[in-house]
Amino acid sequence: MERNVVIRLENVTKSFDDQVVLKNLTLDVRKNEFLTLLGPSGCGKTTTLRLIGGFEKPDEGIILHHGNDISNLPPYKRNVNTVFQKYALFPHLNVYENIAFGLKIKKMNKSLIKEKVEKALRQVNLVGYENRRIDQLSGGQQQRVAIARAIVNEPEILLLDEPLGALDLKLRQEMQYELKTLQKELGITFVYVTHDQEEALTMSDTVVVMNNGVIQQKGTPEDIYNEPVNAFVADFIGESNIVEGIMRQDGVVEIFGRVYECVDKGFAVNEKVDVVIRPEDIKLLEPSENKINGQVTSCIFKGVHYETCVMTDGFEWVIHNTKSFTPGENVSINVDPFDIHIMKKMEKEAGT
């Protein structure tokens, strides 16, 4: 096992009531990494988190911590802390007492507890809130208390199960940057669970996209967004136009009877493929006999861009651009070669 791998799930399978939720999953989590488990409800991401935390045991496979098998080790014996969506703060205790609770259970002396709590308060920007009651705090402040209570124990790994889910959009976006900054300052490993693609792309060093208990793709946010390995990932990570194409040769794909240059190679001649094109990568120009032509069906202003829908041969394209178009207007679909992503048809089946 690599020296910088702190946790490895190796060939892990987990079922509940005869329903398999994780299927022979293998995953490495590295030191000081911000790793996000991303996927729809029921994909197995929270179960994976609970296995790392010791709240569940694998039916098959093992969980290793620095090479040591911890599959049956209870949570309190793991150097791991968890922050849940429901923060589970003690309403009868103030901020200081909530953060200090775990340290008191360990019977640390008061001066050391005070030192550690004050450090945690500084790290989450809550200095001056020590004596506040929990019901006097905003949602964002309560979340900071929950994080402080977790990091005050100085865990090697912090698990976060959709901790921003209860916050409003603006506060959620602010907390994304705060969490990423905090992780870098602490120098510890974060394993974060979310179904929110923006959260995953904004904060993570590594994103693990899951579906039906299987890892679909693991990579940097840029890799996941720009080079999805199958149609599920392409569709789940932001909007995508996914159409059927035919590879005529390396670097040439036919879409709706029109030929486009692309950069993908290694496909058989005349092989049917899935073609993925992001809405922001499409340019709408005057109709052309060499391009796919269609008619604008709608154009909606979204603030930073217009969302334009164009119908061509029974398929409705979604395009994001800065120009307004009129419904009924005739246009052509134009895409640069490096913005056309080709995937094997069989890879779409893996994500369904």
Curated annotation (Swiss-Prot):
It is found in: Cell membrane. ATP binds at residues 39-46. It is an enzyme of class 7 (translocase). Its EC number is 7.6.2.11. It is a peripheral membrane protein. Residues 7-237 form the ABC transporter domain. One of its GO terms (cellular component) is ATP-binding cassette (ABC) transporter complex. CDD domains: ABC_PotA_N. It comes from the Bacteria. GO terms for molecular function: ABC-type putrescine transporter activity; ATP binding; ATP hydrolysis activity. Its main location: membrane. SMART domains: AAA (SM00382). It catalyses: ATP + H2O + polyamine-[polyamine-binding protein]Side 1 = ADP + phosphate + polyamineSide 2 + [polyamine-binding protein]Side 1. Keywords: ATP-binding, Cell membrane, Membrane, Nucleotide-binding, Translocase, Transport. NCBIfam families: MMSYN1_0197, potA. Belongs to the ABC transporter superfamily. Spermidine/putrescine importer (TC 3.A.1.11.1) family. Part of the ABC transporter complex PotABCD involved in spermidine/putrescine import. Responsible for energy coupling to the transport system. The complex is composed of two ATP-binding proteins (PotA), two transmembrane proteins (PotB and PotC) and a solute-binding protein (PotD). This is Spermidine/putrescine import ATP-binding protein PotA. It comes from Acetivibrio thermocellus (strain ATCC 27405 / DSM 1237 / JCM 9322 / NBRC 103400 / NCIMB 10682 / NRRL B-4536 / VPI 7372) (Clostridium thermocellum). The lineage of its organism: Bacteria, Bacillati, Bacillota, Clostridia, Eubacteriales. The gene is potA.
